[in-house]
Swiss-Prot record:
Organism: Lens culinaris subsp. tomentosus
Keyword field: Calcium, Lectin, Manganese, Mannose-binding, Metal-binding, Signal
Binding-site residues for D-glucose, renumbered to this chain: 111, 129, 246-247
Protein name: Lectin
Coiled coil (residue ranges): none
Length: 275
C-alpha cells in the first residue's frame, strides 16, 4: 500500500510539474493580437467613439467640416494592449488609412490632422494648432500620448523654422521630435502607413499620393524616429484620429482605416476583427 501511495504521489508531482511548465510556456509564448479593417464607414459605426465634431457620413469619417474653430476626434472603441507589465513585451503594430484634407483655398488651410495613441480615458485637448491632442509645447509626461501629425498651419512657437507644412512625430508635446516637409495636395486622397517595430522602437511613417496630377512635386514621404512606447504610453491605450480648424480651416476626412498589432509573451490571447 505504501508503495502504491508513493507511486501516486510521484505521479501527481510529475503531472503538476508538467502542468506548471505548460502554463508557463503558454504565458510566455502566447501572442495577443488585435486586428480590424474598415473599408467604408457606416452611419452607425459601432466600433468608433466620436468626440467633438467627429461623425460618419456617406462612407467616410468626417472629423471637421471646412468651418472655423472646430475639434473632431474618433477613437477605436476597444482598448489596445500595447505593452505587457508582467513580461515587459511591447507590441509590434501597423496601421494604414486614407485621408483627404479639402480647403476652399489651398493657400489658407488649418490646422491639421493626427493619428494618435493615448490613455484609455483620453478626451479632446486644446484646439487650433494643438490639434485636439496636446495642451502644451513643453514636454509633459502626464500626457502619455504619441501622435503622428499632418500639420497644415505654421505656429511660430513650436513648428519648424522653415514654416513649411509638415509631417511630424509628437511625443508628449505638440513640438515634434522629428519632422518632414510635406506638400499638401488639397482635395487629393493620401495613403498613409504607420508601423512600429518593438525590437528597435522605431516608428515609421509613409505618406503617398497615388493619384497625383502634380508630377513635378514630391508625392511620397517617409519619416522615422525612435519612440520608446513603453516609457511613454500606458499599458492599455486607445488609438484614433483628431483634426482641428482655427481662423483658417479645411474639411478633414478619413476614407478607410485598418490596424493590426501583435503583443508576444502575454498571459492571454485575443483577436478582434471588425469590418
Amino acid at each position: 500500500m505504501a508503495s502504491l501511495q508513493t507511486q501516486m504521489i510521484s505521479f501527481y508531482l510529475i503531472f503538476l510539474s508538467i502542468l506548471l511548465t505548460t502554463i508557463f510556456f503558454f504565458k510566455v509564448n502566447s501572442t495577443e493580437t488585435t486586428s480590424f479593417s474598415i473599408t467604408k464607414f457606416s452611419p452607425d459605426q459601432q466600433n468608433l467613439i466620436f468626440q467633438g465634431d467627429g461623425y460618419t457620413t456617406k462612407g467616410k469619417l468626417t472629423l471637421t467640416k471646412a468651418v472655423k474653430s472646430t475639434v473632431g476626434r474618433a477613437l477605436y472603441s476597444t482598448p489596445i494592449h500595447i505593452w505587457d507589465r508582467d513580461t515587459g513585451s511591447v507590441a509590434n503594430f501597423v496601421t494604414s488609412f486614407t485621408f483627404v484634407i479639402d480647403a476652399p483655398s489651398s493657400y489658407n488651410v488649418a490646422d491639421g490632422f493626427t493619428f494618435f495613441i493615448a490613455p484609455v480615458d483620453t478626451k479632446p485637448q486644446t484646439g487650433g494648432g494643438y490639434l485636439g491632442v496636446f495642451n502644451s509645447k513643453e514636454y509633459d509626461k502626464t500626457s502619455q500620448t504619441v501622435a503622428v501629425e499632418f500639420d497644415t498651419f505654421y505656429n511660430a512657437a513650436w513648428d519648424p523654422s522653415n514654416k513649411e507644412r509638415h509631417i511630424g512625430i509628437d511625443v508628449n508635446s505638440i513640438k515634434s521630435v522629428n519632422t518632414k516637409s510635406w506638400n499638401l495636395q488639397n482635395g487629393e486622397r493620401a495613403n498613409v502607413v504607420i508601423a512600429f517595430n518593438a525590437a528597435t522602437n522605431v516608428l515609421t511613417v509613409t505618406l503617398t499620393y497615388p493619384n497625383s496630377l502634380e508630377e513635378e512635386n514630391v508625392t511620397s514621404y517617409t519619416l522615422n524616429e525612435v519612440v520608446p512606447l513603453k516609457d511613454v504610453v500606458p499599458e492599455w491605450v486607445r488609438i484614433g484620429f483628431s483634426a482641428t480648424t482655427g481662423a483658417e480651416f479645411a474639411a478633414h476626412e478619413v476614407h478607410s482605416w485598418s490596424f493590426h498589432s501583435e503583443l508576444g509573451g502575454t498571459s492571454s490571447s485575443k483577436q478582434a476583427a471588425d469590418a
